[in-house]
Design a protein with these regions (language model features):
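Phosphodiester-processing cores and adjacent nucleic acid-binding clamps
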Residues: 1-193
Length: 193
């Protein structure tokens, strides 16, 4: 199953409608698929309904933007080390996970909105029950550390995320779209695991 996928609800990053997605997934013989739109869950119900109708198991997710510090901190992006929030894939394992996803997505807008709707690790730790975490794309914090060859810091953060999500609920995501940086990070992730 694809566990990191953007629909039309990921503005400027996703092109497929939820109904078209589940129809294609079914056509390919896949039994399940996740939708992890950037910073929102606007399409979650539409996706869930379409997947159920098509006989495909829907995995509800969310690609969170994680503030480099506190979600309450608002300052010029130029002052930030990386200039933006990190990405982190969150997947609901169960009903409690879905509730926590909705809390995180809502609080990202009401408490952490600064250019993007952001959460932080404090909020994630409070609402991690029932969630699975993936390191996301090259914009994920662990992956950025790997790319910079800061393996000790990447291992430390991976350990922290493993504690937040609980054993067996945090994974290093490997992507290969032919981008040299992804291949380099994949090698580092394999070394880290």
């Amino acid at each position: 199953a694809h566990l990191h996928l953007h629909s039309t609800y990921s503005l400027l990053d996703g092109a497929i409608r939820p109904a078209d997605l589940v129809n294609k997934v079914k056509e390919l013989g896949m039994k399940s698929v996740a939708v992890t739109d950037h910073g929102n869950m606007f399409g979650a119900i539409e996706f869930y309904d379409a997947a159920k109708k098509a006989g495909v198991k829907p995995i509800i997710g969310y690609e969170a933007y994680v503030a480099p510090g506190s979600r309450f901190e608002k300052r010029n992006q130029e002052d930030l080390v990386d200039g933006r929030a990190y990405h982190l894939i969150l997947l609901a394992k169960n009903k409690q996970g879905y509730k926590n996803l909705t809390k995180l997505a809502s609080k990202a807008y009401t408490e952490g909105l600064y250019y993007k709707p952001r959460i932080d690790y404090e909020l994630l730790a409070q609402h991690s029950e029932g969630l699975v975490g993936l390191t996301a794309c090259l914009a994920g914090e662990v992956n950025r550390l790997i790319y910079r060859q800061q393996m000790d810091k990447a291992a430390e953060l991976s350990g922290r995320l493993n504690e937040i999500f609980g054993k067996g609920n945090f994974f290093l995501e490997i992507q290969n779209h032919g981008i040299p940086e992804q291949i380099e990070v994949a090698k580092g992730a394999a070394e880290l695991s």
